[in-house]
Design a protein with these regions (language model features):
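Intrinsically disordered, Lys/Arg-rich low-complexity segments
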Residues: 162-170
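Conserved helicase RecA-like core
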Residues: 1-160
Length: 170
């Protein structure tokens, strides 16, 4: 599912989504190490147990974060794509693309982490105005139009939703 959201509202939308207690575990992807740390910090401030893994963390810190996530001491793992490579997580409820990947194949790798071993899993993506081009490239690669969630409290006001009438240029 795709959530169109203004960049400044992504943080609030993520907290809103994670308030659903039926989500036992979530893997949140960012494009950068700095972004992963930032997301982890604001989730922790919102009393959502989160840890970040990325290339600037020691191997020991990454392994501890992963262990805490697998045993559900940590509910949310925030990761960059490189750090998440090779990670095997069973029973992952939700993958959240907090930032749309700029490489379409990366999207496929990210969403492939949910619903393994015949279990239910879901992937959602937050798309702001600057990420629309990445979304187009992803949809072209997978040949699927990703369903849009058009009712949420932080719906973007400046991103045209597919099928909406286009504004005429003066």
């Amino acid at each position: 599912e795709m959530y169109f959201v203004d960049a400044e509202n992504k943080k609030d939308l993520l907290i809103h989504v994670l308030q659903d207690k039926s989500i036992a575990t979530a893997l949140v992807f960012t494009r950068t190490k700095h972004g992963a740390d930032k997301v982890q910090r604001f989730l922790t401030k919102a009393h959502i147990k989160a840890e970040a893994i990325h290339g600037n963390k020691s191997q020991n810190a990454r392994q501890n974060a992963l262990r805490n996530f697998k045993d559900r001491t940590t509910r949310v793992l925030v990761a960059t794509d490189i750090a998440a490579r090779g990670i095997d997580i069973d029973e992952l409820n939700l993958v959240i693309n907090y930032e749309i990947p700029n490489i379409p194949e990366t999207y496929v790798h990210r969403i492939g982490r949910t619903g393994r071993a015949g279990l239910d899993g879901k992937a959602i993506s937050f798309c702001d105005a600057e990420e629309r081009e990445f979304l187009r490239d992803i949809q072209k690669l997978i040949s699927i139009k990703i369903p849009v969630v058009d009712e949420h409290p932080f719906i973007a006001v400046n991103i045209p939703v597919e099928g909406a009438p286009k504004k005429k240029k003066p």
